[in-house]
From Swiss-Prot:
Keyword Cytoplasm belongs to the record: yes
InterPro entries recorded: SmpB (IPR023620), SsrA-bd_prot (IPR000037)
Endpoints of the signal sequence: none
Protein's UniProt name: SsrA-binding protein
Claim: Endoplasmic reticulum is one of the keywords in the record: no
Keywords per UniProt: Cytoplasm, RNA-binding
GO terms assigned for molecular function: RNA binding
Main location: cytoplasm
HAMAP family, per database record: SmpB (MF_00023)
Family as reported in the entry's similarity comment: Belongs to the SmpB family.
A GO cellular-component term linked to this record: cytosol
NCBIfam families: PRK05422.1, smpB
One Pfam family recorded for the sequence: SmpB
Protein's organism: Petrotoga mobilis (strain DSM 10674 / SJ95)
Length: 150
């Protein structure tokens, strides 16, 4: 499994509740660009429309080797999941007020490009501060234990 791109802000801005693996429908030039790692996740999200899961705001840079037959970098991309999983996701999003965000794009052992999506809950500003303070406290404890063991 090779990670092509990771959404670094996702764990900072959201509380991850559950993760899923989905296939993604890409054009040929998008596959080449994504395998080169030219993907940007900034402000990306997933939405269910007409029973299909769609990925928005993922920028895949145009492939330099393709002349005029390049893709639109910002186009919405269809994610491939079973209908049962899509219905389950839709019910959770509607009932619990969760959002779906992509966490990472990677290739599996067969060379297929997959997207790890998450059901997440947005964090408020005070939650983020609390999380940062908690991490800082844990870091201090680990540092202190390290020096005591020496």
């Amino acid at each position: 499994m090779t990670t092509l791109a990771r959404n670094k802000k996702a764990t900072h801005d959201y509380e991850i509740i559950e993760t899923f693996e989905a296939g993604i429908s890409l054009l040929g030039t998008e596959v080449k660009s994504s395998k080169a790692g030219k993907i940007n996740f900034k402000d990306s999200f997933c939405k269910i429309e007409k029973g299909e899961l769609i990925l928005y705001n993922v920028h895949i840079s145009p492939y330099s080797g393709a002349s005029i037959f390049n893709h639109d970098p910002e186009r919405p991309r269809k994610l491939l999941l079973h209908k049962k999983e899509i219905r389950r996701l839709q019910s959770k999003v509607q009932q619990e007020g969760l959002t779906m965000i992509p966490l990472e794009i990677y290739t599996n052992n067969k060379g297929l490009i997959k997207v790890k999506i998450a059901l997440a809950k947005g964090l408020k500003k005070y939650d983020k501060r609390e999380k940062i303070a908690e991490k800082e406290y844990e870091r201090r404890i680990r540092k202190q234990q390290k020096y005591e063991n020496i």
